[in-house]
Amino acid sequence: MSMSDPLGDMLTRIRNALGRKKDKVVTPASKLRAHVLDVLQSEGYIRGYNQVDLGDGKAELEIELKYFEGMAAIRDISRVSKPGRRVYVSAKSLPQVANGLGISVLSTPKGVMADHEAREQNVGGELLCRVF
């Protein structure tokens, strides 16, 4: 069975693992997922991730979740643009997440980046998810 929203699946796996206080979570690999994880790692929301080759051209991403004094670094992570309803924003209309305490992850012509980077580079794009 094919998955209709692979990025939404990864975000749900992360949310569920954080709720169960897991140290790691595994998800199928893709370039978009890896780019989103790069943004989450650079912003300090996860410790890191490794790509594990399973053979037959398949791979998995092993994500190391981050906790601080028993609390998860990610309080909320949600998908914004979905396969049935894409959400695009311009550089000027980028919304703030939690009054600037969280980030939005965007897919832009210059690559996947956080909202503050998109404002600096004056580019808009598809609003993939929000993290707080």
UniProtKB/Swiss-Prot annotation:
PROSITE patterns: RIBOSOMAL_S8. Pfam families: Ribosomal_S8. This is Small ribosomal subunit protein uS8. Keywords: Ribonucleoprotein, Ribosomal protein, RNA-binding, rRNA-binding. One of its GO terms (molecular function) is structural constituent of ribosome. It comes from the Bacteria. One of its GO terms (biological process) is translation. One of the primary rRNA binding proteins, it binds directly to 16S rRNA central domain where it helps coordinate assembly of the platform of the 30S subunit. Part of the 30S ribosomal subunit. Contacts proteins S5 and S12. InterPro entries: Ribosomal_uS8, Ribosomal_uS8_CS, Ribosomal_uS8_sf. It comes from Bartonella tribocorum (strain CIP 105476 / IBS 506). GO terms for cellular component: ribonucleoprotein complex; ribosome. Belongs to the universal ribosomal protein uS8 family. PANTHER family: 40S RIBOSOMAL PROTEIN S15A.
